[in-house]
Amino acid sequence: MAESVDHKELSESNQEELGSQVMAEGPGESQDRSEGVSIEPGDGGQHGEETVAAGVGEEGKGEEAAAGSGEDAGKCGGTDEDSDSDRPKGLIGYLLDTDFVESLPVKVKCRVLALKKLQTRAAHLESKFLREFHDIERKFAEMYQPLLEKRRQIINAVYEPTEEECEYKSDCEDYFEEEMDEEEETNGNEDGMVHEYVDEDDGYEDCYYDYDDEEEEEEEDDSAGATGGEEVNEEDPKGIPDFWLTVLKNVEALTPMIKKYDEPILKLLTDIKVKLSDPGEPLSFTLEFHFKPNEYFKNELLTKTYVLKSKLACYDPHPYRGTAIEYATGCDIDWNEGKNVTLRTIKKKQRHRVWGTVRTVTEDFPKDSFFNFFSPHGISLNGGDENDDFLLGHNLRTYIIPRSVLFFSGDALESQQEGVVREVNDEIYDKIIYDDWMAAIEEVKACCKNLEALVEDIDR
């Protein structure tokens, strides 16, 4: 018993020495040494199991040591396999994620940072361009103001245009003032050069609005009414009725927003203006809707302001989008009692459970309306439908308000329809070409089959 105990203590000391040697040596040597360990026949079954367990533990330690040595080698960058992985991940099929730049070689990474610095400088120049362009827009807005003011006066019957101002040559495109002067035609002649002057009115008789014919027709109507003994009361509307309502309803994006209960209010619009921010203020533009005094709300002016992104963020200067709208704010509408078209009021009768008394409770629910466009809550890029709202504000400022008469007359709609028809025709044309090509290919295939059949017959 004493010998077996001494032998067991000796084997345990040998295992500890062997484990310390494995930690000091490489994985290959530890594996060879572990394979060289033998079990003596006189040790007994218990000693054999302990030796096998020690061998398994030594192999695990060897694997951990090998992994540790591999990490150290990777940090030092001394293997040939690591040199092959220096290529960008984007070039070997990996997704371009945030760690892509970190995976690039040091020199390439420095060049990318240099490009980012150049991009930041370009964004600063773009921001400066936007501010100067806004100043130019402000300058020309003052030049447009007399024209827009006369438009307002004509719409609201403040000013009646003269006969000369109503002469409009509708068939002329790109008509310049130089073409309104007299043009000189030179025709060859045997006796010499004969100069014939062409009047500027030639070819435009059908384009003019003939006031003389209208006066004659009115005189005939008056005489007919006098002879018949009946008075003819013709409507003589002032200005252009429902001008802005018609303009807004002819805008595709605004059509679903305008409800029937909105139309009586929109008929009271006298003008819609675009006001640019003053010098020194943040870049923005404001849409101003001017109304007549009415029974619906106390406001005579409803506004919506769009603030433009004109400065770079210090923490992230790169996602600069140029003339992008950063956020928008509306205004509060002071509705008269019972006239709020953006809310639906429901009255409910409630009975008390104990006392049996009845009371009437009113509850308001939001309702679709054009006037939700003036919601006072600011809309930023984190909103849900901000892109549609920003696009609508941009179109109102750039296209709809400056060219309102074209939307009223339908000319803008015709141009949009022509664009759609052109696109459809292009698609139809492409389909015809494709069908012709496919038919030609099928004919060639049929000819080839016939030739193959003829060749087979000849061979037979």
Curated annotation (Swiss-Prot):
> Does Cell wall biogenesis/degradation appear among the keywords?
no
Where, subcellularly, is it found?
A: Nucleus
Q: Where is the composition biased (Acidic residues)?
A: 213-223
What are the protein's GO molecular function terms?
A: chromatin binding; histone acetyltransferase regulator activity; histone binding
Which Pfam families would you find in this protein's record?
NAP
Keywords assigned by UniProt, alphabetized? Nucleus
Q: In which tissues is it expressed?
A: Brain, specifically expressed in neurons.
Which family would the database say this protein is a member of? Belongs to the nucleosome assembly protein (NAP) family.
From the Swiss-Prot or TrEMBL record, give the protein name.
Answer: Nucleosome assembly protein 1-like 2
Which lineage do the record's taxonomy fields give for this organism? Eukaryota, Metazoa, Chordata, Craniata, Vertebrata
- Gene name as annotated: Nap1l2
